[in-house]
Amino acid sequence: MSMQDPIADMFTRVRNGQMASKVSVSMPSSKLRVAIAAVLKEEGYVSDFAVSGDVKPVLEVTLKYFEGKKVIESIERVSRPGLRIYKKKDELPKVLGGLGVAIVSTSKGVMTDRAARKAGMGGEIIGYVA
């Protein structure tokens, strides 16, 4: 059975891993998943990530906790295969009034809503993290 929405699967694995207080979660790797993991690391939501394996690459995301509490309060998919959500540069959403981030896929790569606004670019809203 093929996976219908790999990004929703990634978000679910991270959410479930944090609820179960896991140190890290593993998933099949792809360029988009690695780019999303890089944004999460850059914003301080995960400790680290690594790709291993040649034939079937596996992405391992090391989760982050602060004083025993999970760092990611919520992670949700916005644009999905059945309903893509695109926003122009001045329509990009602010998650929790700027406390969270929206992950945006632009023509220059995957970045946060703040970076996209600064670059003057819009794109597909992949998801929200807070």
From Swiss-Prot:
Q: Show the InterPro entries listed in the entry.
A: Ribosomal_uS8, Ribosomal_uS8_CS, Ribosomal_uS8_sf
Keywords on record:
Ribonucleoprotein, Ribosomal protein, RNA-binding, rRNA-binding
SUPFAM superfamilies given in the database record: Ribosomal protein S8 (SSF56047)
Q: Name one Pfam family in it.
A: Ribosomal_S8
**What is an example of a GO molecular function annotated in this UniProt entry?**
structural constituent of ribosome
The UniProt entry's GO biological process terms, in alphabetical order, are: translation
Entry keyword annotation includes GTP-binding: no
In the UniProt record, which is one GO cellular component term?
ribosome
Q: Subunit comment for this entry?
A: Part of the 30S ribosomal subunit. Contacts proteins S5 and S12.
Its family remark reads:
Belongs to the universal ribosomal protein uS8 family.
NCBIfam families the UniProt entry points to:
PRK00136.1
Q: What does this protein do?
A: One of the primary rRNA binding proteins, it binds directly to 16S rRNA central domain where it helps coordinate assembly of the platform of the 30S subunit.
Protein name as annotated? Small ribosomal subunit protein uS8
Q: Which gene encodes it?
A: rpsH
